Amino acid sequence: MDYLPIFMKIEQQHCLIVGGGTVAARKADLFIKSGAIVTVVAPKLGNEMTFHLAQGKIIWHMNTFSTALVSELPRPSLVISATDDQNVNLAVYKTYHAQDIPVNVADQTEYCDFILPAIVDRSPMTIAISTGGRSPVLARVMKARLETMIPHGFSVLTDLVGRYRQTVKNVISDIDGRKTFWETLLSGLFIDKAVHGNTGEAEALLEAELETIKNNGQSLPQGEVYIIGAGPGDPDLMTFKGLRLLQQADVILYDRLVAPEILEMGRREAERIYVGKKEKWHKMDQKDINQMLVDLARQGKRVARLKGGDPYIFGRGAEEVELLVQHDVPYQVVPGITAAAGCSVYADFPLTHRDYAQSVALITGHQQAGAQGIDYARLAQSGDTMVFYMGIKNAPKIQAGLIAHGLCPDTPAAIIENGTRLNQKVTVTSLAKLSETIQKKSIKPPALLVIGEVIKVRERLQKKSLLDDRVPA
């Protein structure tokens, strides 16, 4: 390592900033947030530094830095020079470096005893990223990625854990025991309660665990289930929360609509169980899947149930949750981008457009025996954009039903195969030719049927879409 990563406590310590511009103001802001007494030496101040002065957060010496000025300034713990004058910057470095006071000259690593990293601030948690001064831009790129991955609620979580640290130490005397306790707690429901502001519930979980340890001498493993919407196929469309929960799961249950790349995002050591279904062939009955979730959670395991699209849109997620509730199994449901939303965008047309459609109907094309049939009369007269899930097999019935109830046979229809994936294929036809097109092109599931005038917009949008370089039309 070129630099030792270290966090310094500078509260109520004097720190010196030489320079009054934008860069200097941003450095001063870090000192201010850390509670330092900040002195600024500059002949004039920019807008940001003037704001700090107006807030009473800095002490300003309206001078150009010189060695003669040093005796008038309090001895600083840290010094940053951020001016456009290289002679001034060099003078600052030589003056304070000779006194064994750490100095940083902005953008000149050869004159830096310390460097300031890119920071992800979740105070009291702080994450620092450094490239050793080689590429501040790369450090900022990494910071941006971490900002999206780490919820702001981690500040609440960190504070909560800190408040209970001594309490846990009083109950669990050995270090290994405390380590196990915190590792278990911080990979389960507790962390999500705290991060999302449910501190009361988080504290109740923590205290219940401690009470169990007091009474039994050990904490009983408590499993939980995550019903995660994996989105329509493209791994980049997975939500951050879904990814975070997937990566802490001990067991992953998945179906055929989940992309292999998404499955690979789970922990390498996690057990993977395929529970997918195909028409006329079911790997596992839905009731058995529901019970498996309960059984695995009762073994103390964290179970991720990955479902294509969104769990509550033709995903039978509610059936799984009902049984979890009946058995008092803790669970979370993570929404996913449903196929209708994702596939239409990747096929270069919207689902609504004020010139064509003001509403959308999501319809299952696979009807359960005994279920109420599709209301073709309402759909044909509604003006909705119609999206049929699992509708390939029943396309002839869908086509006939809509035409019989008055929908124009020339209404555009789109068939999206493997939507949002690299092998996506979009076929545009008319309602009158829908079944013929599916048969002629040997189209197989997974595929989405979209019927509506809004598909006409595709020709205009497709000309400039960056997605055209990613997926074939």
Swiss-Prot record:
Any GO molecular function: NAD binding
EC number(s) from the headed UniProt entry: 2.1.1.107, 1.3.1.76, 4.99.1.4
Catalytic activity: uroporphyrinogen III + 2 S-adenosyl-L-methionine = precorrin-2 + 2 S-adenosyl-L-homocysteine + H(+); precorrin-2 + NAD(+) = sirohydrochlorin + NADH + 2 H(+); siroheme + 2 H(+) = sirohydrochlorin + Fe(2+)
Residues binding NAD(+): 22-23, 43-44
This protein's pathway: Cofactor biosynthesis; adenosylcobalamin biosynthesis; precorrin-2 from uroporphyrinogen III: step 1/1; Cofactor biosynthesis; adenosylcobalamin biosynthesis; sirohydrochlorin from precorrin-2: step 1/1; Porphyrin-containing compound metabolism; siroheme biosynthesis; precorrin-2 from uroporphyrinogen III: step 1/1; Porphyrin-containing compound metabolism; siroheme biosynthesis; siroheme from sirohydrochlorin: step 1/1
Pfam families given in the database record: CysG_dimeriser (PF10414), NAD_binding_7 (PF13241), Sirohm_synth_M (PF14824), TP_methylase (PF00590)
Region (Uroporphyrinogen-III C-methyltransferase): 223-473
Task performed by this protein: Then it catalyzes the NAD-dependent ring dehydrogenation of precorrin-2 to yield sirohydrochlorin. Finally, it catalyzes the ferrochelation of sirohydrochlorin to yield siroheme.
UniProt similarity note: In the N-terminal section; belongs to the precorrin-2 dehydrogenase / sirohydrochlorin ferrochelatase family.
NCBIfam families noted in UniProt: cobA_cysG_Cterm, cysG_Nterm, PRK06136.1, PRK10637.1
Identification of the protein by name: Siroheme synthase
